[in-house]
């Protein structure tokens, strides 16, 4: 019976890992659909390279920093050979170490790819690649160690079941730093500083991406049990209810606020609910999940407006609001509604992770800006990154209207 349970755990964790991997396709579709056609190929390349670089650098360095030893702040063993961390039977945290490693790898790549959309349409490809490697080496693994690797936050009882904090808030705050440092797209703001809408070129692609992400989120949250347990259905229910509540509330808020139900904002509402419930999906009941999702559905609308109109940070896909703000919201709500969780502990974790992430991300992007540069030239941005960065177009033989 014990061997059967281990095999079931292995199969379930691998299924979860495969679903989380496919979230890369969801992010690629959302980001491509919400931006202009002339930059589609560049966005697809960035999403692919997030997974490629995340896989390699997390294997070589990141996994050791995250899970190598019981130091409260940083892992200290397993560099370049993470499988050396396994016990004599090749097991790690109750699973064969290869199974555990691939599951953690896809989570790392998910955090990295959140930044792509926020910096879309004006960022140098080489600079983005360096960022993508860096987050997989020393940003995500360090805070991940604090939360999931036996570090100081886990020791004081901080709860982040599937990554509202460790994955989404970290990625969202890196997106905030990156979007601020690279600056807004040409034509995003008038001379008076008023924001100008720059519509995405393909809402059907964006919708497909949202559906893919919603589907894969069941692997993200339910798979985080890393075991075939009886509470999988409960986790799936809280995940789905939060997303549904957030979507409906965002639709209503935009309908009232703008006079019509906004399509792209409503899609982001679904993602906001999923992000917000990810920390607490295992420790809240169904109605608490609905409430968390509903609040996220309101917050995401006003967060997008705040960054767009008040602080004037250009985020083409709303990644900062969806992942950064709603990740923080989910972190704190876990302390209010989560069974056995403590608000002060969650607040401490939020502040610590936010401070570390923002400081490191701003330093990284500042260095890139002052050395090789973060931004493409004005001509490259106006013409489109596909042709200038990659020498081809995602839509061959189509004519684009290139405006500023």
Residue ranges and their predicted role:
Residues 1-404:
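Hydrophobic alpha-helical transmembrane bundles of multi-pass membrane proteins
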